[in-house]
């Protein structure tokens, strides 16, 4: 028996049903790599960030996520080079889908019970995605903006439903917009932390604090 088409599991009808001690025998998801490209590039290397955002409330199979990842990666490797981008998959397939197998051969009615005991066996995993939730994000240099958008446009064809491509106003994968990031960086308030940054709050030495207290209460 072949794999049941993913269109049968497209909509979020049931509650989340993750793998657990009650839900055993779940096959491994097809997607195993969620970060690829130049993952260790510093936050300064890749200021551009582009998101592929879902425009529907639906379920995406792990096979579709893997196909989209491969499609995006192949295009960027060919037209940008393998060290000029960092792709991050933003969805993880945790929801388990079930199948109630039915026999279709002659005399099947003697062997099976139809819809009696119809709670199926685990068949695969899908990711539940909301409207406005990013499916995948790419950070790169500004000179490769057109190539990144085209790679995500091609990856859209691997997913059901509608998606939109957003060019983020933020610096890379950080939470700061570009102007704000440059201000904080010039003030030495940011500390690089892999592909992100840590904010250094205004904590002075204790002597400076004591002096300020004396000035206030003098």
Swiss-Prot record:
One GO molecular-function annotation for this sequence? Answer: structural constituent of ribosome
Superkingdom of the source species: Eukaryota
* SUPFAM superfamilies in the cross-refs: Ribosomal protein L16p/L10e
GO CC annotations?
cytoplasm; cytosolic large ribosomal subunit; cytosolic ribosome; neuronal cell body
Q: Is Ribonucleoprotein one of the keywords UniProt gives this record?
A: yes
Give the residue range of the signal peptide: none
Keywords annotated in UniProt: Ribonucleoprotein, Ribosomal protein
Classification via Gene3D superfamilies: Ribosomal protein L10e/L16
Q: Is Chloroplast set as a keyword in this record?
A: no
Q: Which InterPro entries match?
A: Ribosomal_uL16, Ribosomal_uL16_CS_euk_arc, Ribosomal_uL16_dom, Ribosomal_uL16_euk_arch, Ribosomal_uL16_sf
Q: Name one GO biological process term.
A: translation
Q: Which CDD domains match?
A: Ribosomal_L16_L10e
- Oligomeric form and interacting partners: Component of the large ribosomal subunit. Mature ribosomes consist of a small (40S) and a large (60S) subunit. The 40S subunit contains about 33 different proteins and 1 molecule of RNA (18S). The 60S subunit contains about 49 different proteins and 3 molecules of RNA (28S, 5.8S and 5S).
Checking NCBIfam families in the record gives: PRK04199.1-4 (NF003239), uL16_euk_arch (TIGR00279)
Q: Which protein family is it in?
A: Belongs to the universal ribosomal protein uL16 family.
Protein name per the record: Large ribosomal subunit protein uL16
Name the species this protein comes from: Drosophila melanogaster
Q: What is the lineage of its organism?
A: Eukaryota, Metazoa, Ecdysozoa, Arthropoda, Hexapoda
| Gene name as annotated | RpL10
């Amino acid at each position: 028996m072949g794999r049941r088409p993913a269109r049968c599991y497209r909509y979020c009808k049931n509650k989340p049903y993750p793998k657990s001690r009650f839900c055993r025998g779940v096959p491994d998801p097809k997607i195993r790599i969620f970060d690829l490209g130049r993952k260790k590039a510093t936050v300064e290397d890749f200021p551009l960030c582009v998101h592929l955002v879902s425009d529907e409330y639906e379920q995406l199979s792990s096979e579709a996520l893997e196909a989209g990842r491969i499609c995006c990666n192949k295009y960027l490797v060919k037209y940008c080079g393998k060290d000029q981008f960092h792709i991050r998959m933003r969805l993880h397939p945790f929801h388990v889908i079930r199948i109630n197998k039915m026999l279709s051969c002659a005399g099947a009615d003697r062997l099976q019970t139809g819809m009696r005991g119809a709670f199926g066996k685990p068949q695969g995993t899908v990711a539940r995605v909301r409207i406005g939730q990013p499916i995948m994000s790419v950070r790169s240099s500004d000179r490769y903006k057109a190539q990144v958008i085209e790679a995500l446009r091609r990856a859209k064809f691997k997913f059901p439903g509608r998606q939109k491509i957003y060019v983020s106003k933020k610096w890379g994968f950080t939470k700061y917009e570009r102007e704000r990031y440059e201000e904080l960086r010039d003030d030495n308030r940011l500390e690089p932390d892999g592909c992100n940054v840590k904010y250094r709050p205004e904590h002075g030495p204790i002597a400076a604090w004591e002096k300020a207290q004396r000035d206030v209460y003098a």
